[in-house]
Amino acid sequence: MKLELTPRQRKILWATVRRYIATAEPVGSKTLAQSYNLGVSTATIRNDLATLEQVGLLFQPHTSAGRIPSDFGYRVYVNDLLSSANMDGIPNDAPQPEPHPALQQLLDQLNRELGDDLDSFLQRVAQLLAHLSGCIALITPPQGPVVAVHHVQLLSVGPGRVMVLVVTDSYQTHSALVSPPDWPDDRREDLEDELQLLSNFLTLKLRGKTFAELQDLSWLKLDEEFRAYSHWLQQLLRSVVQRYLRPSLGQVFSAGMTELMRQPEFSQAQRMQAVAQLLEEGSEQLQGMIGLYSTPGCLFTSEAALSAPSAREKASSSTADQDPSHNVPVIIYIGSENPLESLHHCTVIASVYRRRSAPLGTVTLLGPTRMAYERSIAAVQTVASHLTRALA
């Protein structure tokens, strides 16, 4: 059955959620009447609050308290009411659609300071996002078949072992140990020279090719000089590609535990410990939620989150000309929508950053369900958009 709310009930739900997000205190009819121009008596507001509670949008933590939003109430707020400010008579009490007035400038500054040190850059971005949002920020590094090769180097690391180092165009380094080829007898004394010659050849042949393209690369037509190595080169590339395209469990740049501890919802040690344990020990579970794995775009597929267009998606068409980051889609899990039970008291907001329209990595905020949704959504969009441009 479709939920039908009167315009006044929509206003009251909107105001209740906004007030609770701002204060973390249950909201009563008197507070709403004093703080918002609803144009009705406290008795009428009280009746509407009771109706909103009956349909599951609000609840009372105890009998004498005001109301607070349920997970369902937050979902209606995010999917429907965020885009309705200044519409249907819903008041607009200083909304904050931008994550921080200087976020983009701060991201640009980090780019200049850290240059090609991608890992340090992503860690600093996670710290910045956590500081501005008051939530835990999680960023996965670039992965997937669209990352391309920039340089290849072969090194002898001991008897019978060769290390292949691959530097990608996103400034990451990947390595694998392989057995050396069967060197021709007249070249065994020139091992280092041969490895350098092969390194130069591989760099020239592979630069600009994605890891997906390496899987189908043919080594049948080689110059006479390298023909003896064709089988070994095929095995080497297969080893590198399989190692790179295998899901990376555990590599997540994170920050914000201290910020989250300041939230009143996490004053209970049990809740904080559950999140901390997930971040420290549950890398496989966490990557199952925020990782890309081998399926492009498999990030967050909650039916509840996708059952209606998000407010941000609705608003993006009117704001795209002002800020392209508003076109970045986000997926949101609220409370019990989270697949992990330890996050049933949390909201997760996530997006992907891309190259060539394919997902590279993820940007995620994890915080209480009482989250400043407008600001948090905008922050995730801004960071994802920046990483897409920076790693293009």
Swiss-Prot record:
InterPro entries cross-referenced by the UniProt entry: DeoR_HTH, GAF-like_dom_sf, HrcA, HrcA_C, WH-like_DNA-bd_sf, WH_DNA-bd_sf
Keywords, in A-Z order: Repressor, Stress response, Transcription, Transcription regulation
Pfam families, per database record: HrcA, HTH_DeoR
Protein name per the record: Heat-inducible transcription repressor HrcA
GO terms under biological process: negative regulation of DNA-templated transcription
Entry's Gene Ontology molecular function annotations: DNA binding; DNA-binding transcription factor activity
PANTHER family in alphabetical order: HEAT-INDUCIBLE TRANSCRIPTION REPRESSOR HRCA (PTHR34824:SF1)
Similarity-based family: Belongs to the HrcA family.
Recorded superkingdom: Bacteria
Function comment: Negative regulator of class I heat shock genes (grpE-dnaK-dnaJ and groELS operons). Prevents heat-shock induction of these operons.
Gene3D superfamilies the record matches: 3.30.450.40, Winged helix-like DNA-binding domain superfamily/Winged helix DNA-binding domain (1.10.10.10)
Organism: Synechococcus sp. (strain JA-3-3Ab)
